Amino acid sequence: MGEFWIKGPKAFELVQKLTTNDVAALIDGKVQYSCFPNDKGGIVDDLLVYRFSAEKYLLVVNAANIEKDWAWCTKWAKELGMNVDTDLENASDNICQLAVQGPLALKAMQKLTTANVVDMEYYTFQEIPFAGIDKVIFSTTGYTGAGGCEIYAYVKDAEKLWHAVFEAGAEFGIKPAGLGARDTLRLEAGFCLYGHEIDDDHSPIEAGLGWITKFVPGNDFINRAYHEKLKADKPTRYMKPFELQDKGIARQGYVIEDAEGNEIGVVCSGTVSPWTGKSIGTGYVKSGFHKLDTEIFIRVRNKALKAKIVKTPFF
């Protein structure tokens, strides 16, 4: 992941400008899911916002987008008259993140600290001594839908952290999981992935992220008027989850059709869910085909596979 520190008297103003969610609703020790809107109606990236104080925030962005996200943040910091050399810090090369997920994660991790982590609320964080490391950021967040935590430490402590976590988790059956497993889990949970469900060309309103796009007084985020109008006028396309009724797997870029074979959308993500054994996916469909239980068809090579719009999570 990428980690950016935003500090100083204009920190709140910058983060509020950069993100669609309402940063004013955050208090110290809380985390907020949000996104960076661009200036043409799409999304630069999605991220987590950590509030340490009114003048100190940590933004956690996608690793693949670090360079462009940093350029975007510094551009707007300069617009606000901030000193990008002292008020902003790209700490991505110095910080590592280890995600420990699942219903037993907090119980297992409690063995590694004297701080109370097992009773932490969802989307909160603490700076605590952990696994013999003086200080980590322990965050009850994750990208799997299974609960658990994400632990941020300095890169120099990464190997020590890894071994300690696996030793503590051994009695609970802990196992390593890579990006492929994470992608399957996030899709089953109905979470967006940048470059799939969200990108530079789709609004958070179209992507089903209206819940993190707050049109409240004082939340003057970038291009707010565009998204507010889009919400009022109703989008012409919606990102929706679907479940295949016929045998096959939907993949990103596959065409979505109606019963007459007319193109009505495109697949964002698809896989066979290990949890349910069903073939699942997400895609953008034209307005009118986005309602629950609507029948759609996925064009897989020369076949049109029947599917229907469903709810998330898929499990």
Annotate each PLM feature:
Residues 1-7, 142-147:
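Conserved phosphate/anionic-ligand binding catalytic regions in large, soluble enzymes, centered on
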Residues 1-3, 12, 46, 56:
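A common structural microfeature
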Residues 1-2, 29-40, 88-98:
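Short, glycine/charge-rich beta-strand/loop segments that flank catalytic centers
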Residues 3, 25-28, 176-179:
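Short, surface-exposed helix-loop/turn micro-motifs enriched in polar/charged residues
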